[in-house]
Regions:
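Conserved functional hotspots at enzyme active or ligand-binding sites that engage polyanionic ligands
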Residues: 1-108
Length: 108
């Protein structure tokens, strides 16, 4: 089984979807802790898109010299079989922002 790490950017096939859920094959950020990633067949992800507006639950960052957005308001858990490729790790500054937005949005 492939090992996936928290804050790793991966390509995920999100189809099939319903309604306003983000769809198709796209980059996603793994946000579940490594302990969960190691022991379960699922990971929790935030989809990434290059087409978004500024919004409090969306964080911009550069990926392949293109501005992309981590869509924290569409966080969800997926089976690892949906992952098709590992791209790399999110930068430290963006990780700090992701943690803060997740805490602000879901913990308080």
């Amino acid at each position: 089984m492939i090992k996936y790490s928290q804050y790793e950017i991966v390509i995920v096939n999100l189809d099939p979807t319903v309604g306003s859920e983000m769809k198709k094959k796209r980059p996603c950020l793994i946000v579940s802790p490594d302990e969960i990633n190691k022991n379960l067949l699922t990971v929790t992800i935030c989809p990434i898109t290059s087409q978004s507006k500024k919004y409090p639950t969306r964080i911009s960052f550069e990926l392949d010299e293109i501005t992309n957005w981590i869509i924290i308001d569409q966080i969800r858990t997926i089976d690892k079989s949906r992952i098709t490729k590992i791209i790399g790790m999110l930068d430290d500054d963006s990780i700090t922002k992701v943690k803060a937005i997740i805490k602000e949005t879901f913990v308080d």
